[in-house]
Regions:
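Short, C-terminally biased terminal segments at protein or domain edges
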Residues: 2-4
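N-terminal glycine-/serine-/threonine-rich phosphate-binding loop
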Residues: 7-53
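Structural motif
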Residues: 21-25, 52-54, 158-162, 197-199
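Charged helix-capping and loop-helix junction motifs
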Residues: 37-41, 174-182
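Glycine/small-residue-rich interface belts in oligomeric ring/scaffold proteins
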Residues: 49, 53-75
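Ligand-binding beta-strand-loop-alpha-helix segment within the catalytic cores
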Residues: 66, 70-160
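Glycine- and Gly-Pro-enriched alpha-helical subdomains that act as flexible
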Residues: 181, 189-191
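Conserved small/polar residues in nucleotide/adenosyl-binding loops
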Residues: 202
Length: 202
């Protein structure tokens, strides 16, 4: 406890009073393999208190793109997202992977809600400018609506966030899941005592 005359006493007390929130990011390998997905669902459901889950899905996107005859191009571990690839990642990240996680969490008593950045304008991004590499339809996060997420969280909803954002002009953007987790945690840290956990398995 702070000393009564400490100049930081009120700040420290406010920190102690803030609700705790855990933001967890998991990579594609975890959510795309049945055994690790089941373990994730069980472990995440067991975490008490407010929480947010951010997921990847790159392996599934690569697999389905290949089945559709669309070549996946990577530079420095980042996906080049042309118009056709954007369709694939939107379907895979925002649909297949996200909804499988949401359904699994609902089965475990977690009131999960799947979101992309376009849903309720929760995360807006700007298309990454072309420098040495043209990454295509890849977004750099501009704003996370922390108030909206906090409202959902306080209503008992657990956001499950796909690695997709939008530019506010009708365009979806492929966005790095680590970045989404970090920016979400940063925005929510104004309202909660946030712990950010980034999985090292991609």
């Amino acid at each position: 406890m702070p000393e009564p005359d400490s100049p930081f006493g009120e700040l420290i007390r406010n920190q102690e009073m803030r609700e705790k929130l855990t933001v967890i990011k998991v990579g594609g390998k975890i959510v795309e393999e049945e055994a690790t997905l089941l373990q994730l669902l069980n472990d995440f459901a067991a975490i008490s208190g407010h929480k947010v889950l951010v997921h990847g899905g790159g392996r599934s996107a690569t697999k389905i793109a290949a089945q559709l005859g669309i070549e996946s191009k990577m530079v420095n571990g980042r996906r080049i997202t042309d118009a056709e690839t954007l369709k694939v990642v939107t379907m895979v990240y925002g649909g297949l992977v996200n909804k499988n996680i949401v359904a699994g969490l609902q089965a475990r008593g977690v009131n999960a809600l799947g979101l992309t950045g376009a849903d309720m304008n929760v995360i807006r991004s700007v298309k990454r400018p072309v420098k040495e590499v043209d990454y295509g339809f890849v977004g750099d996060v501009e704003k996370v609506d922390a108030s909206l997420l906090a409202d959902l969280i306080h209503k008992g909803v657990v956001p499950v966030m796909a690695p997709l954002t939008h530019d506010g002009q009708g365009n979806m953007l492929n966005t790095n899941a680590d970045t989404i987790a970090g920016e979400t945690a940063k925005a929510l840290s104004a309202l909660f005592d946030v712990t950010l956990v980034l999985s090292l398995i991609h």
